[in-house]
Structure formats: C-alpha cells, structure tokens
C-alpha cells in the first residue's frame, strides 16, 4: 500500500506536472531539492550524494552555490526550472511556491553560464513541403535559423532537401548550437537525422509538431519583432524556407524566458555559395577551432591566429575561420585593412592596448535591453565607450578604415557615454538594493531620500532648532524610544509656551511629551528612507536602462565595428610576430603557388627557425593558356612516416584557408585563386556506434569528395586505400587518383605509401617526396619536399623508434630482404628477350588495364608471405602453387 503523501510532496508533484521536460529546482529553505528519477539523474551528472526519505530518492544543492551547478547542467544539455518560495514560511502551514524562471542551454543570458569567446546559439530546422525559389533554383528546401539572444546575432540559411544530410551536418558543426528546435516530421523523412544528432551529444534537442512551423504566423512574429511591415528588406517572404524556423525561435525565446527581445532587430540571410565549403571531416582534420586530441583550442589554427583583445573579436574570429570567403573582392578588402595595421606598428600597438580596456559591448547592451543587468554592467559599458571614443580619435588621425561612424552616430555615442557618466555611481555593486546605484545630482528625488537617510541627525537638529525659535522654549528636546518613536519633550516650567500644533502624547512628573505633524513626517521619511531609496533608485535605473536599450541597434553596430577592428589587428599581430606575408589573390585562374610555406600551428610550437619551409605549385586542369599546360594539378607525395607528409598537406590547406578569411599567410610568397571547397581526408577512425569500420569511414569520406569536388576545389588526401588488402587498396587509390585527375580536375595533393602510383604517367601529375638522409644505417628526416618518388618507406626504422622489440624488427628486416630479392629476380627475368615469334600479352579488359601499374609478382609475394604452411591443407597448398604459377606465366 502506498504511503500517504505530505502536503509539500503533493505541491511538488503538482508543479512538476507542468514542467515535465525540466529539472525542477524545488526550494526548501537554504537548499534546492530534486526528487525521484530526476534526483538520480542529477546526482549522477553533478556527482552529488543521493539520499532517500520515505523511499523517495532525493538530492540537493545549497541555493547560494546554485549557479555553479546550473552551469554544469546546462553544459550537459539540460533545462532547469527554478521554483522559489514566494511567501514567508508559516508555522504549521505550507509555504507557497512557484516557478520564477526556466533556464535552457540556448536561452540563458547570464554571464555566469556563458563562454565569453563563443556564441551561445539556439537553432531551429525546418523542411518545406512545397517547392520554392532558392539559392539552387526551384526546389524543395530546408531552412536553418539560429540566434544568440545575448548578442542579438540572428542568422538563417537554406539548402535543397536533397542535400539535407551533408548541409545540415556541415552547418551544425560550424555554429555548434547549444540547443535546437526540430520539426517532428524530419525524423521520418530523414532517418540519418538521429545519426547526425548523435555527433553532438551535449546539444539539447526539442522536437516540435509541423504546425508549430506555420509560415504566416512566423512572418507576423518576425515583422512584429523587427518593427517592419514585411520582410523584403531581409530578402525574405512568406514562402522563404528560413521564415518558419526563425519565427519559432522568437516564439520559443518569449515563452521560455519571458523577457523582452526587442533588441533582436533583424536577421542576416546567407547562402552556402558565399563561403568556402568545409565539411565536418575537413574542419576536424584541419583542427580549425579545436584539436583532435582533447577537443580544446590548444594546437588549433584558432589558437595560432588569436591575438584578439575583446570577447566580441574572439567570437568574430571563430566565425571567420568557420566561414572563409569565396569573393576575391571581399577578401582583398579584408586584406587591405590588415595591411594598414601591419604597416603602422605604432598605431596598432595603441589600438591593441585600448582594445584591452573594452569589455563585451554586445552582451552588455543585450542584457541592458532585456533588463537583466546591474550597475556594474553599466559602468563596464561606460568604460568601453570611453575607450572607443579615444580609439576613434586615433583612427581618424591615422585615416584608418575602421569604426566608420557618421556625425550623428558620433554624437549619439557621446550622449550615451555622458548619460552613463552622470547617472551611475562609480562605487555601485551588482546589487540593486544597497542604496549606492545612482550618482548624486542626477535625480532630485533620489538625492532627497539619500539626504534624509544619510543626514537624519542633522535634519532632526535643524527641525529642533526651528521649533525652539518659533516657540521660545530654549530647552526643548527631541528624544526617541521604541514605543513612541521620535517625540518632543517640554519641561513643566515651559508648558504654557507650548503652541496649539503640539500634540500631547504623554505626561510625566517633570515633563510632558509631544509630537507634531512635521515631526511625524520626518520620522516616516527617516524610517522608510532605505526602502524608498531602493525603490527610487530602481525606478531611475530602469529609466536609464530603457533609454540605453532603445539604442541597442546602434550599440550592436558599434560592437561589430570594434570586433572587426579587433580581428584585423589580431591578423596583423600574427603577421608581425611570425613573419607572415600578404597573399596575392587571382580571379578564376585556378592557381595555387606557395613559396616557402609553413604550417601555422606546428611552427608556433617550435623554436624560431626550426620549421623547414616547403613550396608547392598546382593549377586546376583544363586551362586555355598553353603556357599553363606544364603546371601540374595533381601531386603524388611519397615518403616515410614521420617525414612530414601530413604536415605538408595540412599546411597547404591552412594557407589557402587563412588567405580566404582575410589573413596574411605563413609563406615567403603565396599566389592563390580562391577555392570554392576544401576537402581534407587525412586519417580515419572507426565509428562503432554506427557499425562503421575505419575503412568504411574512409570510403564514405572519399565518396563525398568525389561526388562534391569541382575544378575550383582543393583536395587533400592521405593514405587512401589503407585498411583493406593491398590489391584492393592499391586499385582504389589509383581509381580515385584517375577520377580526380581526369574528371574533376581539382588541385589535389595525394599522399600515399603505394609507390606504384608514382608510375602514373600524365602531363598534369607531379611526383614529390619528403627527403631523407641515410648514413651508417641511420636515417634523418629532412622534412624537405623535393621532386621525385620515394624509394623506401623506412617503416621498420619508424617501428624501432616506436619501441617495437628488436626480435620483431630483425624478423621484419629478413622478410623485407626476401621480398626485395624476389623482386630483383623477377626484374631480371622480365629484362630477358622474349622467345622468337611470341607476342607481349596485353590487358584484355578495362579492369586489367586499370591495374597495369601494379606488378603481379608483388601481389603474389605478399600472398606467399602471409600464408602459413603449418595451417594450410595439402590440397589447398597445391591449388595456391598452381594459381601463382599460372599468374606468373601470364595464363
């Protein structure tokens, strides 16, 4: 039989029924308590002690430390509902409680729960069920919208539903939202959705029915928020696939947070064709924002170029790295700005120092507009605006192309700064109830109350002095006790002089006590001055915030200008510190010509001068200029492990990417034609959760490249074909090479240990190798890329460096010697003249022709070495020998 529930538990269950998806923080005195399965889950996530009361699992956290635990739950992708006590506890009665706030990973606005240098995006995705005109013509489209409520940044894009899996994964990987709203029917339409979402385990997922994505309602909500009659100014209409998810985001923000979101004043629409395409594998393999080892920013490209001084600049730098430009003109505009700071080191140093004193204007103004702020925020904004004004004067003097404000905007900037200077007390705290919020002289009402609070004794003394003069009672006194409060005491000898407006309160043996209406008012003012001061200051503070919030659009624009300046000075600083050069961009030529290129990350972690620079020159296939026919488009790169192949591959891709985000590059010289896509297939791991082997993952990535690359792409491939038999791997590697070379004609760097590929003959192929110095049985990796094909992979040497036992190394050397001797014998036999009248056998099928570069004897030798005589049945052995004999004789 179930035990009867207490009134408090019935109250908990009643509130919990309304917040089924949230973790309910139920306030009990000085703790927030959780119960039942929720307590079990929270105790596991937060590593709390799980207890029981009346067989009910429970755990709790101190309310004063709640922010620490809330932050951890948000990072784990959880929603939290804060349930507070809203009435004072009554003996024997039940305290009233209600949910005062719901916090979710994508709607949180408090600094304590945010990463300063990263956006906190809330996203929504929708698939249209009717054809519309979009970036790729007339088609069925999916729309993706995402917003950072803390900054007001609002973006949306669309892509054909036929590309949903690739494009959705690509965009989600780029923006890394903390929370996403998903159209329910997408699960059925795209079974791969579950697979994609599993890649982002900490991203909170909310599924909404299709009717929630109503285009008409979404358009109305967007227009209402933006204050416009239609969405034409944002290149949108009711049929745009971006509209339904964007509208739902605003609805969700209003419902969950209950805040004013009027600071969200517009939305930026973009197309994939505006930016370089970077698939998920490429972003990870190039370690753009995080490294592959521990997923931290250390040893990433972001770390190598991040010399930003503001949180806004850091966030913009992340976005620029994730979204390189395709347009030569836009890239050159960015490079011009970097160059202006690169050339003027003195101005750049002053700008860097000034930027260091600018706080997060984007999020400060966002919190002010949402009325989620305090006095310290306003002081931080004032400090930041002062720094912007100082920096603006220097920029004008130097005629630099930054902080482009017109006269009206400059005036507004000064007015906002002056309002903050005059209104907010420099000694204020984050508390809004300590009476130290509003500066003296700004509000007459506040000043009056402060005067009463701070000068109560002087006010009473002045009143007493006035009454003495009016009554002529020189020994009139003001006294105080808890029972009567303040009162006037008149000695019996002066009772006859007491005026009519004195109100008798009590008679004593030697004196009488009186009050007056004026004294009552003074007492009331003194007793209530603290409460009245808090109310008055809060009223004035809200007025100041409302005024500043009304200029959020301007402050957001100002923040964007500061962020852009910060990113450009960061690029200039990287160029100065690491001797980077400005790349030269060429339109549509397909050229990639890097002289003395270096890996930006590896070089940063070596001693100065230790990194060995290398050059590469490639040109996309099919060029009209006859002189260009001698420039290769496809580089086959061979060399030992640890010689530097992967570093060379990645540095080439990173130099291209750096150029297209508008940065100088680590090279003596770089002449580049902007690429439309960068593919980087280097290394692979299995995906056991999906049932995918390492080889299958590699083939999936390779297939995506072959189906997506264009002539204007840059393709980086390392060790294609490994993970299967040598015959299959070699065949796949050659077939992939031929397709890239003859069909796609993209600029390609193809690293391999299949040395047979170096025998491919084509006017657009170049063989490159990593040079090695061999002397006295030892080898030195020179890290230098030179023309030619490697003759040895030195795998046994590298195995020795890794600590493989000497007995194993010796056996490997013997096997390698046997194989090389066998190969020599075959070479001698092939060199002998053929019998008179005999004809050379030619391949009889396309498949045989495709494999003509792969010596049959090497394949057979590999089979012999892998066959164990002790484990092979006699009949099987005879069959193998007959097969080898026939293949060697060409039958």
From Swiss-Prot:
ATP binds at residues 639-646. GO terms for cellular component: cytosol. Residues 827-854 are annotated as: Disordered. The keyword ATP-binding applies. The keyword Metal-binding does not apply. One of its GO terms (biological process) is mismatch repair. Transmembrane segments: none annotated. Keywords: ATP-binding, DNA damage, DNA repair, DNA-binding, Nucleotide-binding. One of its GO terms (molecular function) is mismatched DNA binding. Belongs to the DNA mismatch repair MutS family. This protein is involved in the repair of mismatches in DNA. It is possible that it carries out the mismatch recognition step. This protein has a weak ATPase activity. PANTHER family: DNA MISMATCH REPAIR PROTEIN MSH1, MITOCHONDRIAL (PTHR11361:SF34), DNA MISMATCH REPAIR PROTEIN MUTS FAMILY MEMBER (PTHR11361). This is DNA mismatch repair protein MutS. It comes from Treponema denticola (strain ATCC 35405 / DSM 14222 / CIP 103919 / JCM 8153 / KCTC 15104). The gene is mutS.
């Amino acid at each position: 039989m179930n035990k009867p529930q207490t009134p408090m538990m019935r109250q908990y269950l009643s509130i919990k029924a309304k917040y089924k998806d949230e973790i309910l923080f139920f306030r009990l005195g000085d703790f927030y308590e959780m119960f039942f399965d929720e307590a079990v889950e929270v105790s596991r996530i937060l590593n709390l002690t799980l207890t029981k009361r009346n067989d009910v699992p429970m755990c709790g956290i101190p309310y004063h430390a709640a922010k620490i635990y809330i932050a951890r739950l948000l990072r784990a992708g959880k929603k939290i509902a804060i349930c507070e006590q809203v009435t004072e506890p009554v003996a024997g009665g039940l305290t009233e409680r209600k949910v005062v706030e719901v916090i979710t990973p994508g709607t949180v606005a408090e600094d304590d729960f945010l990463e300063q240098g990263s956006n906190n995006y809330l996203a929504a995705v929708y698939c249209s069920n009717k054809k519309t005109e979009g970036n790729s013509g007339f088609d069925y489209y999916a729309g993706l919208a995402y917003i950072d409520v803390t900054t007001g940044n609002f973006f949306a894009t669309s892509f054909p539903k036929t590309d949903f899996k690739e494009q959705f994964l690509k965009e989600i990987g780029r923006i890394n939202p903390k929370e996403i709203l998903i159209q329910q029917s997408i699960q059925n339409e795209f079974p791969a959705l579950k697979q994609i979402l599993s890649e982002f385990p900490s991203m909170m997922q909310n599924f909404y029915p299709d009717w929630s994505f109503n285009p008409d309602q979404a358009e109305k909500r967007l227009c209402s928020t933006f204050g416009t009659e239609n969405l034409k100014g944002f290149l949108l209409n009711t049929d745009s696939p971006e509209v339904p998810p964007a509208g739902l985001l605003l609805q969700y923000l209003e419902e969950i947070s209950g805040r004013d979101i009027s600071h969200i004043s517009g939305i930026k629409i973009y197309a994939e064709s505006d930016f370089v395409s970077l698939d998920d594998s490429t972003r990870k393999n190039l370690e753009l924002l995080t490294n592959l080892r521990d997923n931290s920013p250390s040893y990433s490209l972001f770390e190598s170029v991040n010399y930003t001084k503001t949180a806004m600049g850091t966030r913009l730098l992340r976005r620029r790295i994730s979204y390189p430009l395709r347009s030569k003109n836009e890239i050159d505009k960015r490079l011009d700005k970097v160059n202006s700071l690169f050339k003027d080191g003195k101005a750049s140093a002053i700008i860097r120092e000034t930027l260091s004193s600018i706080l997060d204007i984007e999020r400060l103004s966002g919190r002010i507009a949402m009325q989620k702020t305090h006095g310290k925020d306003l002081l931080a904004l004032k400090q930041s605006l002062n720094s912007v004004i100082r920096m603006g004067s220097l920029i004008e003097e130097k005629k630099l192309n930054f902080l482009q404000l017109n006269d009206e905007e400059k005036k507004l900037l000064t007015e906002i700064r002056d309002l903050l200077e005059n209104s907010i007390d420099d000694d204020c705290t984050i508390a809004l109830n300590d009476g130290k919020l509003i500066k003296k002289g700004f509000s007459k009402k506040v000043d009056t109350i402060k005067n009463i609070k701070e000068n109560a004794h002087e006010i009473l003394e002045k009143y007493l002095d006035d009454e003495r003069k009016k009554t002529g009672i020189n020994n009139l006194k003001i006294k105080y006790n808890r029972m009567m409060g303040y009162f006037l005491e008149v000695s019996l000898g002066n009772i006859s002089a007491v005026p009519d407006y004195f109100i008798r309160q009590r008679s004593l043996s030697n004196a009488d006590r009186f009050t007056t209406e004026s004294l009552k008012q003074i007492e009331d003012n003194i007793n209530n001055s603290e409460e009245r001061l808090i109310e008055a200051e809060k009223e004035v503070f809200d007025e100041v915030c409302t005024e500043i919030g009304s200029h959020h659009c301007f402050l957001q624009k100002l923040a964007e200008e500061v962020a852009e300046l910060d990113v450009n000075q960061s690029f200039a600083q990287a160029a100065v510190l690491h001797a980077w050069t400005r790349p030269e961009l060429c339109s549509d030529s397909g050229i990639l010509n890097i002289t003395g290129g270096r890996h930006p990350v590896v070089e940063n972690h070596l001693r100065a001068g230790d990194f060995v620079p290398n050059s590469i020159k490639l040109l996309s296939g099919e060029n009209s200029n006859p002189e260009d026919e001698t420039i290769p488009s496809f580089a086959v790169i061979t060399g030992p492990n640890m010689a530097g192949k992967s570093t060379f591959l990645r540095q080439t891709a990173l130099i291209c990417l750096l150029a297209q985000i508008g940065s100088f590059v680590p090279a003596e010289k770089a002449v580049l034609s902007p690429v439309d896509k960068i593919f980087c297939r280097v290394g692979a791991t299995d995906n056991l959760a999906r049932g995918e082997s390492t080889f299958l993952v590699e083939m999936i990535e390779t297939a995506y490249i072959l189906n997506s690359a264009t002539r204007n792409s840059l393709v980086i491939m390392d060790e294609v074909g490994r993970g299967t038999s040598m015959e299959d791997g070699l065949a796949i590697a050659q077939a992939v090479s031929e397709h890239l070379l003859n069909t796609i004609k993209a600029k390609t760097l193809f690293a391999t240990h299949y040395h047979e590929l170096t025998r491919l003959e084509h006017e657009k192929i170049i063989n490159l190798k990593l040079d090695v110095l061999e002397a006295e049985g030892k080898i030195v990796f020179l890290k230098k890329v030179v023309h030619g094909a490697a003759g040895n992979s030195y795998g046994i040497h590298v195995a020795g460096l890794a600590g493989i036992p000497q007995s194993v190394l010796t056996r490997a050397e013997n096997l390698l010697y046997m194989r090389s001797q066998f190969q020599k014998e075959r070479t001698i036999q092939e060199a002998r003249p053929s019998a008179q009248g005999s004809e050379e056998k030619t391949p009889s099928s396309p498949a045989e022709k495709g494999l003509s570069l792969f010596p049959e004897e090497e394949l057979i030798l590999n089979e012999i070495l892998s066959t164990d005589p002790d484990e092979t049945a006699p009949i099987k052995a005879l069959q193998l020998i007959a097969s080898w004999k026939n293949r060697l004789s060409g039958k």
